[in-house]
């Protein structure tokens, strides 16, 4: 009560903060006359002057008023848009690294130009992060006009562009990209072998558009770069068939946790089916050796009973594609982990892709915390202000609207069941559409959107459906959703980032209708006509009440509901919003108090009749708060566990960077070898043991394995006065001699390259294995709670021990591989190659690279390429053969392999022996 009185008297903390920023806005406005008086060249020269002032010691904060005035003027001249005072406030908030909550239609994209320009003056790069590629490209093109006018460079990172194009985009003053592209480029960069191959430069400042979507909604989904593992398709199919034989009494479903567990009877039946199919040996399903079978069985249960087609995923082109639960968009390239995706593929009978092993991963929480400064923009962030502050240390500032909001938000309407609700929705849509009022209908899934579409077809109401099936025209459909009488059904926040303009979007109409028309007076007249029609149609829509937003269901998060409401009433336009709910809705069914709702519904409520109750609306909000709190706990837990991996990731990535930047890693490699020898001797010949107790057999075996040395350790053991220190010195001396012999014919710069690549390969290999082990540990660590232990503390302890073990393995691998380096001399000259090899740039480049290195790693005397990589000779032979696949004949060189004596003349007529001509590659293949 006292808080409400204080707020009424003094205003909220947000109001007071906004008031303090208005003084800076006045300074910006004071520069407007002088900046407006500059000609185009003078305005563009401002950038040079600002950078000179920065170099002399001025700060960005000191430059802010004049820089913002410069951007405002450049925007007027290039886009015809002048920043409002409230947009200047938004720019200040972004520059300060805070989150600007701005209502839909208030011009967030334009606001970003202020902070982008100011922070780009330092020349360290600014990243503008968007939720999809369309918005990245659109904003880079539109706002790029302002930046280029002022002499700044603009880049945009799109899928499928080359590394060189990415590198140039990141070198630009301002770079537009999606959160996924940025994150994956970071992971890929940290798998490269030279600095020159990397595409990103050091992070500086980022503005995240739709920050709640990226840092909240996607926070539970880590970015993962993975590689394939063994194919287990038959196992997935067999276990899926077992699950399909189970009945409803065999399992219990927990919809809140999206989990399924077998009952006692279900376990017995599952065991019978698994044994009958030969998947389970004699014994209990939950015996230790059956852990993998239990895991796959659990995933198959979840796939069949918890994940719904056209709700959680859809099947497109014989592939299972995940549907984003918050946006309703398809998430191409994303796959559920831990075998769940494969279980769903088995359920749907589509091709089962192999499981993947994690090569590198990071969450968005930890990726964006790599930036020294980040800021964010969104229409809805206040409900998550606590989370933004606790995890990202960012304050949420609500920016006032330029004009008062005139949208009317009506109370929720409750119906007994889904059928009554959809009938009422269809009737309401028909009535409002008849008056010319445009309607945006929000649904939670493809399934519901298509069900409602059937009801509207039955009522004869023309409409458009926008969901993951029809996503290609998303921006166009949403942009025209404000036309007179338009009815648009959209899943969740499809089209986010595209304004719904009343009367339609003139630019989209011009692009669509005048696509075939060439420049000239006729086209100019058509543009004027379209703009006039749009203005007239807008007035009719305003007279009809503006955009009507109709929600068919409450989302788990109040924020998503607020986003849907926010599509209406932009820039002071009138509007209407209303939600229709029923007892069958997931939120009420899973999280709400159904008993209370059912009692209120049954009180003299006829079929098809609605009830409007503040008590029920409050109960809905309570249910949403419960879900939000649960989801926040999940995200917080994800951060806690990923922070453990993040600390280790930083160490590994910093180590890689140090190795790549070093001219020579010889000292580091020598230190690793010495430590490996010291550990070996300490393990087998402890100082506190008698010589007779030493494990000489293990010492001999490990010296051969790690150092490629066959040592007379038994003779050493029998010497008078021998001790572990002498043993270590002798082993190091022998190892030095071996390496000196191995490297004597290799030029120093090439030996340095060999050492560096060997070290990087070892780091990457063991980091990959370490990630896999941490994944497994993460899945089972919660069981420690049953032993009265704190899972996160146990995870930290064990992860640290595993990390130390990994560092030792890296050290041993580097020592082992460098001890086996051998010089490999090719049996041919490049000039002697046959023509069909010379015509392949890939083969020639590979062979030239081999000529430079002239070495190959061997193990136990057998040439074996590491990590399943083919040797250069094999690659040349394979590519040469592949190039000839379409035209093989007896006269073809590819048919001569194995049929001609190596010392016989080559059939090609060169006059050389076969082994020095076309047979040069037969020796290896």
From Swiss-Prot:
The keyword Cell membrane applies. The keyword Lyase does not apply. CDD domains: DEXDc_SecA (cd17928), SF2_C_secA (cd18803). It comes from the Bacteria. May bind 1 zinc ion per subunit. One of its GO terms (molecular function) is metal ion binding. Its cofactor is Zn(2+). One of its GO terms (cellular component) is cytosol. Keywords: ATP-binding, Cell inner membrane, Cell membrane, Cytoplasm, Membrane, Metal-binding, Nucleotide-binding, Protein transport, Translocase, Translocation, Transport, Zinc. Its EC number is 7.4.2.8. It is an enzyme of class 7 (translocase). Zn(2+) binds at residues 906, 908, 917-918. ATP binds at residues 87, 105-109, 499. It is found in: Cell inner membrane; Cytoplasm. It holds the Pfam family SecA_PP_bind. One of its GO terms (biological process) is protein import. It is a peripheral membrane protein. Its main location: membrane. Belongs to the SecA family. Part of the Sec protein translocase complex. Interacts with the SecYEG preprotein conducting channel. Has a central role in coupling the hydrolysis of ATP to the transfer of proteins into and across the cell membrane, serving both as a receptor for the preprotein-SecB complex and as an ATP-driven molecular motor driving the stepwise translocation of polypeptide chains across the membrane. This is Protein translocase subunit SecA.
